[in-house]
Amino acid sequence: MSGKSLLLKVILLGDGGVGKSSLMNRYVTNKFDSQAFHTIGVEFLNRDLEVDGRFVTLQIWDTAGQERFKSLRTPFYRGADCCLLTFSVDDRQSFENLGNWQKEFIYYADVKDPDHFPFVVLGNKVDKEDRQVTTEEAQAWCMENGNYPYLETSAKDDTNVTVAFEEAVRQVLAVEEQLEHCMLGHTIDLNSGSKASSSCC
């Protein structure tokens, strides 16, 4: 186990009011503010953690969900290692907009291989009683759009918040491991000048 910390940039994306700032603040500071205002532009917080023996510094970027802040938030997508697509289970429109957020991120982050980029989907505010999106609907969307992990969270009562960010780290590490395996597999036989066979990628 290496003592060197890996810096990972994670972006929280979703409609305004779904609780992105609250999730970030709950995870980093373990506080919840029911009177929190909408984010203007972007803000970020760091947290150090250890996941499966790897030391990681998670740089969590919270973005403004309103359309009028699009030009402020999109430059910060570049360099992201993972994207947490977030909706509120009591707001059906925020769920239906997930595909738009996914496309916006892929375009502005200039993702080269969208099929293998680590997205995690969060259904937030599960503490609310008047839910408009079922667990099954959300899971089906994840399966259809990239087989993404789906977690239901609540920043208010701290349901699955830590689990969600740790899952983001695991997804990034899994992709990195796969890439390393691919690179090792694509070796060149110097005698023949041809690439050795590889079952990867």
From Swiss-Prot:
Record EC number: 3.6.5.2
Enzyme class: hydrolase
InterPro entries: P-loop_NTPase (IPR027417), Rab9 (IPR041824), Small_GTP-bd (IPR005225), Small_GTPase (IPR001806)
Annotated positions binding GTP: 18-22, 33-34, 36, 38-39, 65, 124-125, 155-156
Keyword Nucleotide-binding: yes
GO molecular function: G protein activity; GDP binding; GTP binding; identical protein binding
Residues carrying Phosphoserine: 34
Name of the protein: Ras-related protein Rab-9B
Species: Mus musculus (Mouse)
Chain's gene name: Rab9b
